[in-house]
């Protein structure tokens, strides 16, 4: 991309080795945890702009979250010490859209991104914001995709833009 215009789009190698399908510029790939660096950068930009305080309780910016036992700071979320669980540690939540949806696994369990169980960002946020802490904040390191998802919601709330646009 140069000056906002796509100047090169290509793929190299194979999209499917078994079938010999070449990779081209139209294939979509899951970024997984690579996106965390963009979320963290956006959070730090907001702090640099004076719009958030990294040592403040996240509920100052996302008041609809549960009232946690202990203060969950933005810094604790960035450093994976917030006490928040991860996708596979959420007990049987469901949504009105799909009352049978049981979010227990992001890979191969009942909750699978991108298929018929797909939740919109808003629907997923409605589930995640009701998840209690697994443990008190700042007690133990535990990798948490949920914390980073909530940080992306914080960026959108505070900036008034999508994470991508911000």
Language model segments and positions:
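Short hydrophobic alpha-helical segments used for membrane anchoring or interfacial signaling
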Residues: 1-3
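Active-site-proximal loop and beta-strand segments within enzyme catalytic domains
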Residues: 8, 12-144, 159-161
